[in-house]
């Protein structure tokens, strides 16, 4: 039977259509996915993301361990609260998961990992951590609410204490701070400003209702997907998995190659892939009628006249732009145009960088 987050009852009270999402009953939408999408782009929306897994690490060798476990380098994290995005790789450089790691103190780091990969992530982390003598705690006692949009911070702040408002004042993106019972982070999955707020499970329902009273719109998985796709953000299982290199998933920027003597899991395989070349993740825009969908073939002719084919990993109609967009994994050599096979027709598409909307504005 699917699990329920501490906010399940609040979702039903808000009229949510609930679906099974990787073993969790989660809201798909609360009536209109499009309205929820526009609320985040134009005002403020909130998402229950309590199905995500929060893992706390304590011990004297955490930094050393995470420098080995992760492709990005936590040596960059020198200011308490600073976070970074990274892949966790297999020895053959496939992506086990993408995650966020927070540096809270020299003997305390926090990871937030995906729900779909929870069991394999925890098993992999435990296995790799064994020699390091760490205390690893899965925080199932905590809930997580993302508040996103141009008015999100202001509306969320109406629920904060004076001390909490002071703690987050001027906080830059990709930081987190423990302020009273709340862990407040300037992270998100929408391409908008906002907070991801962690709280004890027993406080989640009251906090949700407080956000409702502040005029924040509840949003489901449907809007979360169209928002992240407009922002060009990966979804595990679509843009990457254990069979896909981070270099083929627009995650090259998350790999810390320097210092050259840092040994991290997957490094040797990654270096070989970098030398040989990999596929790449691109954006696609189709202004003609129709919708780009995951699994559709993408065809193009490279500069040497060779016919090549890739595949759409995620596609949708963009509510912000008013036409269809997609992410696609394609062989090297693609130019600025291609065609996508939709049923019996080859539809022309424009090839872009992955990412279509930021802070409510088109960037394609």
From Swiss-Prot:
What would be one Gene Ontology cellular-component term for the protein?
cytosol
GO molecular function terms attached to this record: aminomethyltransferase activity; transaminase activity
InterPro entries according to UniProt: GCS_T, GCS_T_bac, GCST_C, GCV_T_N, GcvT/YgfZ/DmdA, GcvT/YgfZ_C, TrmE/GcvT_dom1
- What's a single GO BP term from this record? glycine decarboxylation via glycine cleavage system
User: Under which main EC class is this enzyme filed?
Assistant: transferase
State the superkingdom.
Answer: Bacteria
Catalytic reaction equation(s): N(6)-[(R)-S(8)-aminomethyldihydrolipoyl]-L-lysyl-[protein] + (6S)-5,6,7,8-tetrahydrofolate = N(6)-[(R)-dihydrolipoyl]-L-lysyl-[protein] + (6R)-5,10-methylene-5,6,7,8-tetrahydrofolate + NH4(+)
Q: Which UniProt keywords apply?
A: Aminotransferase, Transferase
Q: Which Pfam families match?
A: GCV_T (PF01571), GCV_T_C (PF08669)
Name the residues that span the membrane. none
What's the EC number here? 2.1.2.10
Question: HAMAP family attached here?
Answer: GcvT
**What function does this protein fulfil?**
The glycine cleavage system catalyzes the degradation of glycine.
Task: Please give the subunit comment from the record.
Answer: The glycine cleavage system is composed of four proteins: P, T, L and H.
| The family this protein is said to belong to | Belongs to the GcvT family.
Q: What is this protein called?
A: Aminomethyltransferase
Q: Which gene encodes it?
A: gcvT
């Amino acid at each position: 039977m699917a699990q329920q987050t501490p906010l399940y009852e609040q979702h039903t009270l808000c009229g949510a259509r609930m679906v099974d999402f990787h073993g969790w009953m989660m809201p798909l939408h609360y009536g209109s996915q499009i309205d929820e999408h526009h609320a985040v782009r134009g005002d403020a929306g909130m998402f229950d993301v309590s199905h995500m897994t929060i893992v706390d690490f304590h011990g004297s060798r955490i930094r050393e361990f995470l420098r080995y476990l992760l492709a990005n380098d936590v040596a960059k994290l020198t200011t308490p609260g600073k976070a970074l995005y990274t892949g966790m790789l297999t020895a053959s450089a496939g992506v086990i998961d993408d995650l966020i790691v927070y540096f809270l103190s020299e003997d305390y780091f926090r990871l937030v990992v995906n729900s779909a990969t929870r069991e394999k992530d925890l098993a992999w982390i435990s296995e790799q951590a064994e020699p390091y003598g760490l205390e690893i705690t899965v925080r199932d006692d905590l809930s997580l609410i993302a508040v996103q949009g141009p008015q999100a911070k202001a509306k969320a702040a109406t629920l904060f204490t004076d001390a909490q408002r002071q703690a987050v004042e001027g906080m830059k993106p990709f930081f987190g701070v423990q302020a009273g019972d709340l862990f407040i982070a300037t992270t998100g999955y929408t391409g908008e400003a906002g907070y991801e707020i962690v709280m004890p499970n027993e406080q989640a329902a009251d906090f949700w209702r407080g956000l409702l009273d502040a005029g924040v719109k509840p949003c489901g998985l449907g809007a979360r997907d169209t928002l992240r796709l407009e922002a060009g953000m990966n979804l595990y299982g679509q843009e990457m998995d254990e069979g896909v290199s981070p270099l083929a998933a627009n995650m090259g920027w998350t790999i810390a190659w320097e210092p050259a003597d840092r040994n991290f899991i997957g490094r040797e395989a990654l270096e070989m892939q970098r030398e040989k070349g990999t596929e790449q993740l691109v954006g696609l825009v189709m202004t003609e009628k129709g919708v780009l969908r995951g699994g559709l073939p993408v065809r193009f002719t490279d500069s040497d006249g060779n016919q090549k084919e890739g595949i759409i990993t995620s596609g949708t109609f963009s509510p912000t732009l008013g036409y269809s967009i997609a992410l696609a994994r394609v062989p090297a050599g693609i130019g600025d145009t291609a065609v996508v096979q939709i049923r019996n027709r080859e539809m022309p598409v424009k090839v872009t960088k992955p990412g279509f909307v930021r802070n409510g504005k088109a960037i394609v």
